[in-house]
C-alpha cells in the first residue's frame, strides 16, 4: 500500500514498524457542540483506513482523543451557566450518537485531555530542562526558533511564519512565534496544580502527551483534517521530537475540506451543517457514503443534489444485495458452476485492492463495487446460476462493503419473513386466479414502500 505522506509530499510505500501493531493517532473533536459534516469526514475516512489495514492483515492500535478542556468549552460553559465537565460530557454523548450512526468503530483508546495532566506536565518539564520551554508568570511557552526542523510538515520557512506572527495583549513571549504549552489560570476558569502554579494545558501539548502515553514516542501514522497541519500538527512535531529526541510520526495523512458554495465549512464561519440535522432528513448512512465517495485528499462540495445522488447510489447497492439473497435462496443445486464467472467475480476483489492500495482511493474502490454490481445484475440475476456462484458474489459484496463500512442497515430477518410470506400468499392467489386478493396484497406492500419485480428466479422485492 502507498499513502501520500504530507511530510514528504509524495506517495510512499507504507511500512509500519510492527505489522502486528500499527500505531495510529487521529485527532478527535473538541467537545463543545454537535459535530458538523466537516468534522465527520476524518472520522469516516480514517475509519475506512483502519478497516482496510485490518482487512489486509495488519493489527492496528488506533487512538483518538477528546479535547475536553479548551477556550471554546469554557466559553460555552459560561454562556450556559454550566461547568466545563457538563458541556464536555454532553457533547461526548452526542458525538457517540453520531459516530455510531455513521458506523464509525470505537478506537482502541479514547483518551481525554483532562485524564492526562500528569503526562502533559512531565513533557513540559522535559522541554523546560532541555531549554525548549520557558515560564513567564505562570504561562509556559515553547521556543519555536530553537527547533531547527520547525515548519517541515507545513513546508513553511520560518521567515514566512515570522511575518504573520504577533504577540497578543497580555502575553509575555520572548518571540511572536512561540506558542503556549501551559496557561496560567484566569479567575473563574478550571485549573490544575503544576510546577508553574495553577493553570491548564495548551491544546497542542495535549495530543503530544496522549500520543506518547498510549502509543509511545514514535508512531507509524498521524492523521487528521487538512486544517490541522498548521499550527496544531506542526507544533505537535516540535514538542514531541524536542522532548523525546526521536521521530514523532513516520507518516502523516490529511483529508481535504468540505466546502459549501466553494467556501470551507466551519463553525466559525457559520456555514456548517451538523451531522444530526442531515441524518434526520437522509439517514446517517447517506452521510457516510458521501464522505467516502471522493478521494480523501480532494475537497468535496456539499449540496442537496449530491446527497440525493448518494442516497440513490446506496439504494442501488441495497437492491442488488437483496436480489442476490433471493437468487441464492432459489438457486438450483443441479445448475453447474461457471468457472469463468467465478473468476470474473474474484477479479473485482483485485480491482478493489488495487484502488485502496493507491493512497486509500475509496472513489475507485466504490467503482470496483459497482462493477461487481453490474456483473451481478447482468450475469447472475438475469440468468440461472449455481448456488456457489451466488454465494461467491454475496460473500465478496459483503466483504468489500464491510471494508467501506456501508450497507449496515440491511433488512431484519423478521421483516423479511413477513414480507416474503405476503409475497407467497400473493403468488398463491394469482395461481388460483384470485386476482382481487393478489391486488390487495400488492397494494398493501406498495403502501409499505415495497416494490415487486419478476425475475427468472421468481419475484424479488425492494424498498422504494
Regions found by a protein language model. Give the residues of each.
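Short phosphate-binding/catalytic loops that engage adenosine nucleotides
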Residues: 58, 132, 450
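The substrate-binding groove and active-site-proximal loops of carbohydrate-active enzymes
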Residues: 78-84, 108-114, 225
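Alpha-helical recognition segments enriched in aromatics with Gly/Pro capping
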Residues: 1-32, 47, 97, 118-325
Amino acid at each position: 500500500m502507498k499513502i501520500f505522506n504530507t511530510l514528504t509530499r509524495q506517495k510512499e510505500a507504507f511500512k509500519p514498524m510492527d505489522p502486528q501493531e500499527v500505531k495510529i493517532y487521529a485527532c478527535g473533536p473538541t467537545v463543545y457542540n454537535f459535530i458538523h459534516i466537516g468534522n465527520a469526514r476524518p472520522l469516516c475516512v480514517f475509519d475506512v483506513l483502519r478497516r482496510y489495514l485490518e482487512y489486509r492483515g495488519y493489527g492496528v492500535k488506533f487512538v483518538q482523543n477528546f479535547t475536553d478542556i479548551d477556550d471554546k468549552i469554557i466559553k460555552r460553559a459560561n454562556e450556559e451557566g454550566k461547568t466545563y465537565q457538563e458541556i464536555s460530557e454532553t457533547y461526548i454523548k452526542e458525538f457517540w450518537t453520531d459516530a455510531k450512526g455513521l458506523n464509525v468503530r470505537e478506537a482502541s483508546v479514547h483518551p481525554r485531555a483532562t485524564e492526562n495532566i500528569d503526562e502533559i506536565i512531565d513533557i513540559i518539564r522535559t522541554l523546560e530542562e532541555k531549554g525548549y520551554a520557558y515560564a513567564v508568570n505562570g504561562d509556559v511557552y515553547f521556543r519555536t526558533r530553537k527547533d531547527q526542523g520547525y515548519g517541515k510538515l507545513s513546508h513553511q520557512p520560518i521567515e514566512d511564519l515570522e511575518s504573520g506572527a504577533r504577540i497578543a495583549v497580555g502575553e509575555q513571549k520572548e518571540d511572536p512565534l512561540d506558542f503556549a504549552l501551559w496557561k496560567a489560570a484566569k479567575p473563574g476558569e478550571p485549573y490544575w496544580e503544576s510546577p508553574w502554579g495553577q493553570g491548564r494545558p495548551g491544546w497542542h501539548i495535549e495530543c503530544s502527551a496522549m500520543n506518547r502515553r498510549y502509543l509511545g514516542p514514535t508512531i507509524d501514522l498521524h492523521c487528521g483534517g487538512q486544517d490541522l497541519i498548521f499550527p496544531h500538527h506542526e507544533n505537535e512535531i516540535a514538542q514531541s521530537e524536542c522532548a523525546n529526541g526521536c521521530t514523532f510520526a513516520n507518516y502523516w495523512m490529511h483529508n481535504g475540506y468540505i466546502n459549501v458554495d466553494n467556501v470551507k465549512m466551519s463553525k466559525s464561519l457559520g456555514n456548517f451543517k451538523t451531522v444530526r440535522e442531515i441524518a434526520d432528513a437522509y439517514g446517517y448512512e447517506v452521510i457516510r457514503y458521501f464522505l467516502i465517495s471522493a478521494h480523501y485528499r480532494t475537497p468535496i462540495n456539499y449540496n442537496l443534489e449530491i446527497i440525493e445522488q448518494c442516497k440513490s447510489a446506496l439504494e442501488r447497492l441495497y437492491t442488488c444485495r437483496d436480489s442476490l439473497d433471493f437468487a441464492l435462496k432459489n438457486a438450483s443445486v443441479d445448475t453447474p458452476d461457471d468457472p469463468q464467472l467465478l473468476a470474473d467475480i474474484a477479479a473485482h476483489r483485485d480491482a478493489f485492492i488495487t484502488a485502496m492500495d493507491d493512497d486509500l482511493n475509496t472513489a475507485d474502490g466504490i467503482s470496483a463495487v459497482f462493477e461487481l454490481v453490474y456483473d451481478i445484475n447482468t450475469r447472475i440475476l438475469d440468468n440461472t446460476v449455481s448456488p456457489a456462484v451466488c454465494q461467491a458474489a454475496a460473500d465478496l459484496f459483503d466483504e468489500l462493503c464491510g471494508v467501506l463500512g456501508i450497507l449496515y442497515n440491511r433488512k431484519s430477518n423478521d421483516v423479511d419473513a413477513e414480507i416474503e410470506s405476503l409475497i407467497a400468499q400473493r403468488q398463491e392467489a394469482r395461481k388460483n386466479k384470485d386476482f382481487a386478493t393478489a391486488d390487495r396484497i400488492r397494494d398493501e406492500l406498495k403502501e409499505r414502500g415495497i416494490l415487486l419485480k419478476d425475475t427468472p428466479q421468481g419475484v424479488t422485492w425492494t424498498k422504494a
